Regions:
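Extracytoplasmic c-type cytochrome modules immediately beyond a signal peptide or single-pass transmembrane anchor
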Residues: 1-6
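Rieske [2Fe-2S] iron-sulfur-binding domain
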Residues: 8-116, 123-126
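C-terminal catalytic domain of Rieske-type non-heme iron oxygenases
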Residues: 33, 104-105, 109-193
Length: 193
């Protein structure tokens, strides 16, 4: 999970984020679809945007290559060979669009896949979709976001956070009365609840 869709509620809204070492650009296109791109120009790799905002297109500050909200290259000004011929034209322009990161939305959340996987988002979520359907996650909004920086491997931290088995032993003076067996379940696809 990358973010909530509400981070880019309107056409032209964008939000830059670093996720697992990748600099990403979340954008809502003219078709109202949320897309995620590598936040780098395809020419020399300059960052396209910083922070959050709204725009009609993405323009690289270095050579002014300009992209649509759908990531397609609009123009690469004066990008010619020694004879003055355009190196990018209608026949190859689509090869120079922004690098789109595979993404999908569900329940108001934006998910990305940075690695190789053959499952679709729906397949990956499995029975989780039905289990949470009654909560109407797509209608919820983030009221407060808290970010913790820690000197730890995030996977170890999350594993400990979802591991309720240790609570009666490690937290015996504070949380031991909580019946963790009533709450903790491991579901298919590795989802914890």
């Amino acid at each position: 999970m990358l973010e909530r869709e509400e981070i880019v509620p309107n056409v032209g809204d964008f939000h830059c984020i670093e996720y697992l070492g990748a600099k990403l650009l979340i954008a809502r296109g003219d078709d109202e679809k949320v897309r995620v791109f590598a936040n780098t120009c395809r020419h020399r790799g300059a960052s396209l945007k910083e922070g959050s905002g709204n725009c009609k297109k993405f323009r690289c500050p270095y050579h002014f290559w300009t992209y649509g909200l759908d990531g397609q290259l609009i123009v690469a000004p004066n990008f010619t060979d020694s004879n003055g011929e355009a190196l990018i034209n209608d026949s190859n322009k689509e090869e120079y669009g922004l690098a789109e990161v595979e993404s999908g939305t569900w329940g108001g959340f934006i998910f990305v896949r940075l690695g190789e996987d053959t499952q679709t988002l729906t397949q990956h979520l499995g029975s989780f979709v039905d289990a949470l359907a009654s909560h109407k996650l797509e209608d919820m909004r983030c009221a407060r976001k808290v970010v913790y920086d820690m000197d730890a491997n995030w996977k170890c931290f999350i594993e400990n956070y979802v591991d309720l088995y240790h609570i009666p032993y490690v937290h015996k003076d504070s949380l031991a009365r909580w019946k963790t067996t009533e709450y903790h379940q491991t579901k298919p696809h590795g989802h914890e609840r």
